[in-house]
A protein has these predicted regions:
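Canonical tetratricopeptide repeat
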Residues: 63, 97, 131-135
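Residue-level recognition of tetratricopeptide repeat
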Residues: 57, 91, 125-126
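Register position in tetratricopeptide repeats
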Residues: 36-37, 70-71, 104, 135
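Structural marker of alpha-solenoid helical repeat scaffolds
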Residues: 53, 87, 120-124
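Canonical positions in the second alpha-helix
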Residues: 50, 83-84, 117-118
Length: 135
């Protein structure tokens, strides 16, 4: 009888863990789908939940930044981009978006620093980099 109870408890713990693991990715995937459908408030909620379950998920921060960009909330956009780069220093999208913010703020020293970083990170998007520096 005691063995049966122990086995039942272990089974429930394992199933609970598997369910939690699945929900981490499910929040991000569902948030991404809503983002693509331009349902930003719902997407923001799910991406924030994704971060609660997995604080080191760089893509969740990146897509939150993209939502804040759509909402014209530059402070939160920049905060989430910085978080993205802390987790994934070679994230090309985050570097480019921060460069755009730096240009808007006329913070050219930061743009130059990010440009050098971007050049090291990316070969495939160098044309984007040259375009931004010309502007």
């Amino acid at each position: 009888m005691i063995k049966l109870i122990k086995i039942s408890i272990i089974t429930f713990l394992i199933l609970g863990f598997l369910n939690t693991s699945y929900s981490k990715e499910n929040f991000f995937d569902e948030g991404l789908r809503l983002f693509q459908e331009k349902k930003y408030e719902d997407a923001k909620f799910l991406l924030e939940r994704s971060i609660v379950f997995n604080p080191k998920h760089a893509k969740s921060y990146l897509y939150l930044a993209k939502i804040y960009k759509e909402e014209k909330d530059q402070k939160n956009e920049e905060k989430n981009l910085e978080a993205t780069l802390l987790i994934d220093p070679s994230n090309e999208d985050a570097i480019l978006m921060l460069m755009e913010i730096g240009i808007e703020k006329t913070n050219y020293s930061k743009v130059k620093e990010l440009s050098e970083r971007f050049t090291k990170v990316s070969k495939k998007l160098c044309n984007e980099n040259k375009k931004i520096l010309k502007d």
